[in-house]
């Protein structure tokens, strides 16, 4: 293979290999591709024109329903704007309402921007000390979920193989009849962060003594909860203080992307990565131990590559090295690759140098590994410092072992009624096949889904839930921290909040269906949060203040814990690697979660920040180097090639994408795709990796060994990947070889490449937009850069266009500066 680009920074594989086609098109901002080519083989006219709005309409998203339903009224009489309550809606003037975005364990304290009574944008709520004004792409995309015309628009009852609409009164009568005659009732729910909703569920179980609540999460953290209960006596997830940690070691925890509370963690992480002074500058050290390139791994200072099956061995190795340095008892080592073995020895010394100010975390769903992680943090003095149980996190409460018991009960025919509260186990539960078989034996199946997902489609009755922007509620994301959910628009369809449905089925309904849960919520806050201390006008003022701010904090008693656990038993119960040639890890990306957001076109067409692909999941394959910047990919596959993937006897066809940073001998595949009931947008997009998952001691495992991949079978005609950027005007010609190459960023290239022609982006000014250094050389590099800026001042004063002296005299007004240390994705 030809000699590749020796630049230290490249924009992709084609740039690195100096692909001839890439070099020819590098100077063009857009590739000329007629729309009819992009649409495939369908017969469409060459003059076909479309825009983003038409595209969304085709997928079933639009403002038509909102325009009819909402009119131009203030959303709901009892809602309080974030700033000033307007007497009337002013056309063209935005009003903000403090609320919360909650879905599938995700939490965001939000400000909902509305115009003419319609939500149009989600911003972060700066009043929240949990998310601190941050948001995610998922939270932003909830606006589009609201206007999804594929939402269920009325109560439904299955009639043979199709659903027919009925009135809420008719539904309530038949559901209450079924509940009153049922022997065993099971309520399947996800993590519930609402104190008021939990109270209501407790009352539901009292009303129907045969009822039980089963909780599970689409992405499980059950092992972490179980280990903390074993070691600290608390079944809770602690507050991980990334803002206090000088050294962070993460074993497969994508805490900047999708793990537990990424909005909160990103802000805290960035606070320790920001450099505010040149002399004596400090920042945290971050080491990521993983096999596939995660968003968090892409931000790490160092990555230690281990196979998924070696994660436990790596954790044991780190523990033993820390134990040696602290005088603690060591445990039996497990086989691990040599590079990781040597690197972990050095990491242990770094951690010891930051005792009490370090943090070791683990994203694996294995109790034994989490127990050893807890002991490592105990030896390092991190417990009650960087790991704080005083403000424990409530965003993960599920345990799939309860689902296994429910599956067994259903298959035995001992369950009469199952009620699904906004969950979709027929898609995202690890044993969906067994669950489906059992569900078929349940006489009454009820769902509160707001769209027709796989589970709702298998139910007899659907009581469609409001979207959260049409609902009332509260959230307790962390101990001592609360926020409210308030409606910002009238319900667009004939739906009803799930909590209101529960109240009606408990005979707690009032004449006004829209206020029954609001009054229940408000009364619960008055009695539970404020212990009835405020009444009358004083309480109304306090409530309005909380609703306006959107968040509330209470002082909680400090929680101090100590470690108690048996490491010998933990390591003896760990499973050794099978030492197979090929392994795969399954992960949650920042786009669609584990399918909760698959029906959202914004998130489907948002490029994955690592592999830059859209509209589907792709098998990430490694790239190997020969030591001279020549590289080849796994099985010589190229982006978009189709292969057969076989895992645990399951075979599926999947396209591949080459990813730098993927460990040799490993592959990766995102969860959340391959939905069979996800509207026009999500149905049939990608492959369902959930069917490839396995269990260990009842807990979902997100990797597999002994897999096989075929050679290239064909090419995915729908493969979509973001075009290269920052290529305009960067092509130059080597005067010695006449070979075209990328001349930009010449401050970073080897001497061989510095003999470039003038007239291109990097060569014109001898300036780059990317500079890098390390903390040790920062003062010297900063002085050099300052001197370089002084010598380049004449370029800032040079006019490109004549006749605009007055404008040029105003000077440059730079609009954006990106700190790549603090920007996490």
Residue positions per predicted region:
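Long, low-complexity segments enriched in small/aliphatic residues
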Residues: 527-612, 763-764
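N-terminal export/assembly segments and adjacent metallocofactor-ligating motifs
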Residues: 2-338, 343-345, 462, 511, ...
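Short, polar loop motifs at secondary-structure junctions
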Residues: 289-294, 448-454
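N-terminal leader/propeptide and maturation segments of large enzyme subunits in energy/redox metabolism
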Residues: 328, 491-560, 641, 725, ...
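Flexible glycine/proline-rich, aromatic-decorated loop/lid segments
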Residues: 451-485
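Active-site phosphate/pyrophosphate-binding segments
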Residues: 302-411, 528-535, 539, 543
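A short, gly/pro- and small-residue-rich
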Residues: 258-280, 430-446, 481-484
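Phosphate/diphosphate-binding loops
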Residues: 424, 434-435, 440-453, 490-499, ...
């Amino acid at each position: 293979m030809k000699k590749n680009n020796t630049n230290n920074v490249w924009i992709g594989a084609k740039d690195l290999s100096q692909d001839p086609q890439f070099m020819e098109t590098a100077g063009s901002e857009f590739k000329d591709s007629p729309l009819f080519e992009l649409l495939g083989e369908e017969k469409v006219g060459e003059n076909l024109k479309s825009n983003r709005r038409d595209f969304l309409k085709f997928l079933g998203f639009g403002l038509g329903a909102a325009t009819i339903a909402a009119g131009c009224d203030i959303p709901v009489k009892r809602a309080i704007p974030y700033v000033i309550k307007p007497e009337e809606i002013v056309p063209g003037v935005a009003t903000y309402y403090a609320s919360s975005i909650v879905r599938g364990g995700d939490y965001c304290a939000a400000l909902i921007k509305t115009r003419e009574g319609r939500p149009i944008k989600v911003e972060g709520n700066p009043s929240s000390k949990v998310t601190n004004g941050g948001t995610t792409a998922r939270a932003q995309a909830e606006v589009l979920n609201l206007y999804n015309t594929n939402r269920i628009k009325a109560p439904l009852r299955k009639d043979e193989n199709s659903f027919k609409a009925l009135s809420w009164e008719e539904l309530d009568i038949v559901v209450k009849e079924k509940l009153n005659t049922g022997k065993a009732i099971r309520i399947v729910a996800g993590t519930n962060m609402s104190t008021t909703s939990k109270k209501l569920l407790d009352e539901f179980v009292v009303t129907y003594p045969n009822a039980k609540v089963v909780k599970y999460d689409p992405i499980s953290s059950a092992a972490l909860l179980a280990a903390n209960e074993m070691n600290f006596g608390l079944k809770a997830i602690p507050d991980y203080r990334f803002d206090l940690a000088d050294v962070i070691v993460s074993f497969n925890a994508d805490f900047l992307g999708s793990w537990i509370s990424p909005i909160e963690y990103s802000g805290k992480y960035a606070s320790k990565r920001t450099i505010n002074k040149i002399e004596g500058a400090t920042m945290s050290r971050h080491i990521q131990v993983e096999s596939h390139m995660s968003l968090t791994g892409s931000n790490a200072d160092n990555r230690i590559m281990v196979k998924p099956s070696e994660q436990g061995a790596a954790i044991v190795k780190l523990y033993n090295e820390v134990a040696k340095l602290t005088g603690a008892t060591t445990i039996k080592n497990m086989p691990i690759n040599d590079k990781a073995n040597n690197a972990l020895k050095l990491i242990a010394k770094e951690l010891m140098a930051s005792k009490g100010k370090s943090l070791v975390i683990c994203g694996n769903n294995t109790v034994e590994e989490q127990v050893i992680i807890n002991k490592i943090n105990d030896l390092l003095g991190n417990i009650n410092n960087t790991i704080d149980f005083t403000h424990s996190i409530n965003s993960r409460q599920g345990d799939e072992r309860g689902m296994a018991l429910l599956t067994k009960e259903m298959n035995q025919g001992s369950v009469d009624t199952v009620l699904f509260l906004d969950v979709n186990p027929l898609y995202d539960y690890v044993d969906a096949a067994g669950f489906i078989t059992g569900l078929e034996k349940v006489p009454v199946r009820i769902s509160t889904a707001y769209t027709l997902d796989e589970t709702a489609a298998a139910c007899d009755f659907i009581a469609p839930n409001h979207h959260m922007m049409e609902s009332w509620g509260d959230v307790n994301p962390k101990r001592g921290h609360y926020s409210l959910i308030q409606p910002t628009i009238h319900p667009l369809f004939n739906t009803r909040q799930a909590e209101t449905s529960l109240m009606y089925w408990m005979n707690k309904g009032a004449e006004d269906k829209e206020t029954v849960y609001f009054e229940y919520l408000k009364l619960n806050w008055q009695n539970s949060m404020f212990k009835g201390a405020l009444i009358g006008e004083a309480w109304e003022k306090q409530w309005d203040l909380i609703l306006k701010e959107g968040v509330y904090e209470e002082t909680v008693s400090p929680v101090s814990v100590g470690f108690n656990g048996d490491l010998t038993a933990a390591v003896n119960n760990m499973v050794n690697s099978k030492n197979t040639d090929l392994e795969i890890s399954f992960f949650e990306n920042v786009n669609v979660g584990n399918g909760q957001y698959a029906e959202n076109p914004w998130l489907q067409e948002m490029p994955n920040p690592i592999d830059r692909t859209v509209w589907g999941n792709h098998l990430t394959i490694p790239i190997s180097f020969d030591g001279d910047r020549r590289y080849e990919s796994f099985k010589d596959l190229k982006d978009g090639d189709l292969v057969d993937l076989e895992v645990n006897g399951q075979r599926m066809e999947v396209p591949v994408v080459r990813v730098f940073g993927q460990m040799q001998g490993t592959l990766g595949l995102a969860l959340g795709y391959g939905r069979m009931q996800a509207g026009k947008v999500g149905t049939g997009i990608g492959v369902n990796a959930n069917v490839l998952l396995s269990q260990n001691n009842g807990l979902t495992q997100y990797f597999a060994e002994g897999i096989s991949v075929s050679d290239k079978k064909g090419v995915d005609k729908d493969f979509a990947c973001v075009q290269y950027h920052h290529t305009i005007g960067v092509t130059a010609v080597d005067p010695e070889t006449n070979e075209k190459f990328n001349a930009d960023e010449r401050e970073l290239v080897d001497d061989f490449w510095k003999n470039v022609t003038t007239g291109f982006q990097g060569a014109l000014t001898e300036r780059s937009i990317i500079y890098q250094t390390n903390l040790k050389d920062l003062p010297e590099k900063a002085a050099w850069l300052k001197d370089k800026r002084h010598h380049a001042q004449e370029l800032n004063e040079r006019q490109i266009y004549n006749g605009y002296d007055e404008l040029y005299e105003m000077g440059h007004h730079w609009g954006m500066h990106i700190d790549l240390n603090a920007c996490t994705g």
